[in-house]
């Protein structure tokens, strides 16, 4: 497959599920995976024999909890000692370790202990989404737009971009999820005049609210707010914790010590949570949950709402903040658009509706697919698509947090205020604090507090070689330049000497070095090759198994009773039994060994089958092997064993 020019796709890289779409022929297609689902679990599993990504990984999680990784988005761009990371680790069955304060997940893969940065795990999910898109399009694609929560920090944005690089993607843009959802809401709705739209995006792990003014294809973000650690996973955790105690009281056993039991309970709780969006009660039935004890219980919607009451109210504070920042009143919002799977929860809808004085909520877009839809549109625009409905479409996004530097006394001096439209550039003159100061330390921070100690350090660099001068005389010009992806470049110039230095804020806190990225790209290629080899091995095994069983079944059937001698029948049955026995005793055989066994089996079978065929065998040929494979393995010029589609 070769990649044609001008094609790109949009990926919603979610905490719990991911989604991919492509814009072509004037419309967006949300692409289904090979199981027919339009969303794919953001899960990666490692076993003794292979790596699994997506649904196959999630489906085996209760059997292999400690080696199945999910929630990578909650780790990406964070420090190991972040309070949210430490809190999450109590709920995760897989192990998280520290590598110079960067979190890494530790798993057992093919008998060895392996550690992966969250960027690497996310890149594996991105590889899966890339493969889904390529299977649909029929050719290779590397250009992509990836979405992130609007309230993500600079380091988390850069780490997401790194994950794209590791997945072999050319990341055209990092787009905020609510902005992408707004495109999905408004595309093809031109000519309605200026609208103030509030996007309420509550997913599996993050919450975002953005207020946009949409007018004739121009999407201008007025304000954004959110919580990068609030979503469906937290609701699941509440329900899991709720059921721990009754089990312990009744049976005097603590299931929290058993990762498999906890994982099975979590899966059941997630299912119950979904049921409670449409029913007032849900049953939980788990056979032999722990030490042979069955766990049968139920939960009402009212009890679930009570368990999560504070979490359900949590999004309202960011909504108020966004309204204040946008300088808009509730009544000035024309549409309240729901995005993200967790907005299906009736109580969340009720709280939001009450907040807006009973206003009708807009549920016109698919909450699971809207973000990928908008990302696909933006990808097409960036690739120069000339479709009529994309003409004059323009995104004007904002910086979610204030950006500044530390000045004397640890004061945060802001250069770019939060909710400033990006891309943007701001320049300010600074000077020295003491006489004959030879250099200055530029420390870049992100946050809203007055003192830098309460904000997040993004990066720092020194500007040295300043000529001796009294304090306050040197003029140091500092420029903050933030691009459309929300990634910041900071430069400083001493105006008298011309000395300068600069930094791209990619944040050491969770940021990978260039060398680490190069190493991981090579490892990703190796894992991809391993996956392909495993697929080929399984295919060879399945083909051999199919031929052996089908051949045995055919010659033992009534149709051939009068057509084949007892001696020939015995030869084929014995060889088939021998092959089946070999497979049972050689579960870890390589692809070449399976292919050799297939050739040996076909040597015995083909001459007898050819003789029968020439004699007019009824009922057709037994199925199981592709024609190409059979021809390779046959010394006969007779007919081959064909696979039935």
UniProtKB/Swiss-Prot annotation:
UniProtKB keywords: ATP-binding, Nucleotide-binding, Stress response
Bias (Low complexity): 623-636
The keyword Nucleotide-binding appears for this protein: yes
GO MF annotations in UniProt: ATP binding; ATP-dependent protein folding chaperone
Region: Disordered, residue numbers: 615-645
Organism domain of life: Eukaryota
Entry similarity comment: Belongs to the heat shock protein 70 family.
Protein name as catalogued: Heat shock 70 kDa protein
Higher taxonomy: Eukaryota, Metazoa, Chordata, Craniata, Vertebrata
Gene that produces this protein: HSP70
């Amino acid at each position: 497959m070769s990649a044609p020019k001008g094609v790109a796709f949009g990926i919603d890289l979610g905490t719990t599920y991911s989604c991919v779409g492509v814009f072509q022929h004037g419309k967006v297609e949300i692409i289904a995976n090979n199981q027919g689902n339009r969303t794919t679990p953001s899960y990666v599993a490692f076993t003794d024999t292979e790596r699994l990504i997506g649904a196959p990984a999630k489906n085996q999680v209760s059997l292999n909890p400690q080696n199945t990784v999910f929630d990578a988005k909650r780790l990406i761009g964070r420090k190991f000692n972040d309070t949210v990371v430490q809190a999450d680790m109590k709920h995760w069955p897989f192990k998280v370790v520290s590598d110079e304060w960067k979190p890494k997940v530790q798993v057992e893969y093919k008998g060895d202990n392996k550690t992966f940065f969250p960027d690497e795990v996310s890149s594996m999910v991105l590889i899966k989404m890339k493969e889904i898109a390529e299977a649909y399009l029929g050719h290779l694609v590397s250009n992509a737009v990836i979405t992130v929560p609007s309230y993500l920090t600079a380091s988390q944005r850069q780490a997401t971009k790194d994950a794209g690089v590791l997945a072999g993607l050319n990341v055209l843009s990092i787009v905020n999820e609510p902005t992408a959802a707004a495109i999905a809401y408004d595309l093809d709705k031109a000519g309605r005049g200026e609208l103030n739209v509030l996007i309420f995006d509550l997913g599996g792990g993050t919450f975002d609210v953005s207020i946009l003014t949409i007018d004739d294809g121009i999407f201008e973000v007025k304000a954004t707010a959110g919580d990068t650690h609030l979503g469906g996973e937290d609701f699941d955790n509440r329900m899991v914790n709720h059921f721990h105690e009754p089990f312990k009281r009744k049976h005097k056993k603590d299931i929290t010590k058993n990762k498999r039991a906890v994982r099975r309970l979590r899966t059941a709780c997630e299912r119950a949570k979904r049921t409670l969006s449409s029913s007032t009660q849900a049953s939980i039935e788990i056979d032999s949950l722990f030490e042979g004890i069955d766990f049968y219980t139920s939960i009402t919607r009212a009890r679930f709402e009570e368990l999560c009451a504070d979490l359900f109210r949590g999004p309202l504070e960011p909504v108020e903040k966004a309204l204040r920042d946008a300088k808009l009143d509730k009544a000035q919002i024309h549409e309240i658009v729901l995005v993200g799977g967790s907005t299906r929860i009736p109580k969340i809808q009720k709280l939001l509706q009450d907040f807006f004085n009973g206003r009708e909520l807009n549920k016109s877009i698919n909450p699971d697919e809207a973000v990928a839809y908008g990302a696909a549109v933006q990808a097409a625009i960036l690739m120069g698509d000339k479709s009529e409905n994309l003409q004059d479409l323009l995104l004007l996004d904002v910086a979610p947090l204030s950006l500044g530097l530390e000045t004397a006394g640890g004061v945060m001096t802001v250069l770019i205020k939060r909710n400033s439209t990006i891309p943007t550039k701001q320049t300010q003159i600074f000077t020295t604090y003491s006489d004959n100061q030879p250099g200055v330390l530029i420390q870049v921070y992100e946050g809203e507090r007055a003192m830098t100690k309460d904000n997040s350090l993004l990066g720092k660099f020194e500007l040295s070689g300043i000529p001796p001068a009294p304090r306050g005389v040197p003029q140091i010009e500092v420029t903050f330049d933030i691009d459309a992806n929300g990634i910041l470049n900071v430069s400083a110039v001493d105006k008298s000497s011309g000395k300068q230095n600069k930094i791209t804020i990619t944040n050491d806190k969770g940021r990978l070095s260039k060398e680490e990225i190069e190493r991981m790209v090579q490892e990703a290629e190796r894992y991809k090759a391993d996956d392909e080899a495993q697929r080929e091995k399984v295919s060879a095994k399945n083909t051999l198994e199919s031929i052996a069983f089908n051949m045995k079944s055919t010659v033992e059937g009534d149709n051939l009773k009068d057509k084949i001698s007892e001696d020939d029948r015995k030869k084929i049955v014995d060889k088939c039994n021998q092959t089946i026995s070999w497979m049972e005793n050689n579960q870890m055989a390589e692809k070449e060994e399976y292919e050799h066994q297939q050739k040996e089996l076909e040597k015995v079978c083909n001459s007898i089958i050819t003789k029968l065929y020439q004699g007019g065998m009824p009922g057709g040929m037994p199925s199981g092997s592709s024609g190409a494979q059979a021809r390779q393995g046959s010394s006969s010029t007779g007919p081959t064993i064909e696979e039935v589609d």
